[in-house]
Amino acid sequence: MGKIRIYSKQPKPIVSLSETYTVSSSYKSGRATLRLTPDGEYLFTVYGDIGESTAKRSSTHKTTEQKLTNNMLKMYEEAQDAFTAIHKKSKLRLASSYSVQQNVKPQGAYQWKTLDIKKPSDNEAKNLVVNEARNLNHNPKGSSVSESDFIKANLEKVKKERMDAWDEIQKLFNLIEKAQADRANASFKKVYDASVRAQQEIIDGASHIVDDAFHSFPNTLIVPFIIELDYKYNQAAKCIDVSIELTEDPSLKVPMKKATLKTTGKMSVRAKTQGDLQQDYANTCLSLMYYVACNVFNITPNIQTCRISLYTARKANGICWMEFNRNRFSTLCFSSLDPLLDMMGWPNVANLKVLKTTSKLDSMEKTTFENQIKSQITSLT
């Protein structure tokens, strides 16, 4: 199977923010516009009779400044998290949520119709016989009859004829309805059985289920740089090995500046240090591994072990390898997870250097990297 390429989906850009508001003093009034640039520059423009110093002293100005500052800090945080906290978008499905009972609902049953012809009543039959007797008595060519005798002689016969005719219609109607019900219910059952089989294939982790999921990843995974995935799945062993190639170097795309809040309440923007960028690279690589692992586990509950290996472009060098098991992975809280700390609890291969104020994740020569992975797997079996 060929590699599966996941194209980048860029986070929202950091843009200037501005707001215009009205300022009033005892005798003057005007409008002011405060603009905050991505570089942390506060630009102030006043319109009307009001002075700049007066406008800046207003409570509206202070509120607006705080609002723009908080919104700009949030944009910086979101841009940073798009790289270093990719895993926070993850949510692992519980194995129990894949059950047939929860995912496949009965298709229903055919609703029988009712015959739209009323059952003959005794009064209707009697009225027919009475009318017939009266018609005979009004016929000048016929002999007159006793109405009561005629009713007595013919009522039961007419009642039976009408009921027999209605019964025949009812039987034919029921036969038609049964045929329609049998066809409809057979179709419902066919759809239900197919849905059950499809869900059971997900539960069992059929190979085509895994293949289909990986081919859908370009539409479902959200990453800010191009990656390529390859995998080897063993259904019987309930294990999958996934390799990730960083087709694009994330260190070249991660935000190069960071914003902080000063004691004055304003924000400051500065270029990241080399240590900051090294930390970002390590966080981004590990966050990506957790993110991919979660999405792989969500394919099927049959996957109990997920091994993720991360490489540079074209697999020139290895970066990191980890082996995750579903049971412990299901206990992680991704919203507060620190991958750099958590990775120590998993079997791993990485050239991670923890320095005083930062962590550095260096790549390894490919052969050395893969030999260490084999050694780790052997020691675990």
Spell out what each predicted region is.
Residues 1-381:
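Long, charge-dense low-complexity segments
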